[in-house]
Amino acid sequence: MTLVSDDAIADRLYRDNYKTIRQYVDILVSRGVDWGLIGPREIGRLWERHILNSIALESLIPEGCRVADVGSGAGLPGIPLAILRPDLEMTLIEPMLRRSNFLTEALDELGLDDRVTVVRGRAEDADLHVDVVVSRAVAKLATLINWTADLIVESGSLLALKGQSADDEVVKAKKELSKRRLSAEVLLIRADPAADVTRAVRVRRAGK
């Protein structure tokens, strides 16, 4: 746990956009729970476990990138990143109709529908090329690599938020990594020095 409250950290990070991220959290607490996208037990730890966890990836994403959030669900990590980083061209990819409808409505309410796009479908079927793919609680690393390899440009990367299983998943993805000539590294990152550590796996072309 942090010594500074997690919403206070978010306030400091988001600055002028704090009102928007606060509105998004309110949407998660209300409609996100009602629609079954967020568990009721998560309400008390939304800032720590979901918002700050998501935006820990921000430091790994270069300015002005095209980013795809694969299996976006309730919009994590894509929406918190898009609010924090208006320079990003964000696409939320979600195969389930109910979830994609939630995303569309949320983006409209947040005023983000002009720069964040929702694509309903599977990542492997998307007609899209991006610099960075992000994902959170979607699938094992080997599966993610298989789903997203054709989405990412040659110089791009996959950033997958993972928990304690990160190192084990990298080992188990060895065959997929080798076949596609990719390298993977586990990174310990924070949204802020006062925030908790987040584990992410970064996958790139070998030698990049």
Swiss-Prot record:
<dbReference type="Pfam" id="PF02527">
    <property type="entry name" value="GidB"/>
</dbReference>
<dbReference type="InterPro" id="IPR029063">
    <property type="entry name" value="SAM-dependent_MTases_sf"/>
</dbReference>
<keyword id="KW-0808">Transferase</keyword>
<feature type="binding site">
    <location>
        <position position="76"/>
    </location>
    <ligand>
        <name>S-adenosyl-L-methionine</name>
    </ligand>
</feature>
<feature type="binding site">
    <location>
        <begin position="123"/>
        <end position="124"/>
    </location>
    <ligand>
        <name>S-adenosyl-L-methionine</name>
    </ligand>
</feature>
<dbReference type="GO" id="GO:0070043">
    <property type="term" value="F:rRNA (guanine-N7-)-methyltransferase activity"/>
</dbReference>
<comment type="function">
    <text>Specifically methylates the N7 position of guanine in position 518 of 16S rRNA.</text>
</comment>
<comment type="similarity">
    <text>Belongs to the methyltransferase superfamily. RNA methyltransferase RsmG family.</text>
</comment>
<feature type="binding site">
    <location>
        <position position="71"/>
    </location>
    <ligand>
        <name>S-adenosyl-L-methionine</name>
    </ligand>
</feature>
<keyword id="KW-0949">S-adenosyl-L-methionine</keyword>
<keyword id="KW-0489">Methyltransferase</keyword>
<feature type="binding site">
    <location>
        <position position="136"/>
    </location>
    <ligand>
        <name>S-adenosyl-L-methionine</name>
    </ligand>
</feature>
<keyword id="KW-0963">Cytoplasm</keyword>
<dbReference type="InterPro" id="IPR003682">
    <property type="entry name" value="rRNA_ssu_MeTfrase_G"/>
</dbReference>
<keyword id="KW-0698">rRNA processing</keyword>
<dbReference type="GO" id="GO:0005829">
    <property type="term" value="C:cytosol"/>
</dbReference>
<protein>
    <recommendedName>
        <fullName>Ribosomal RNA small subunit methyltransferase G</fullName>
        <ecNumber>2.1.1.-</ecNumber>
    </recommendedName>
</protein>
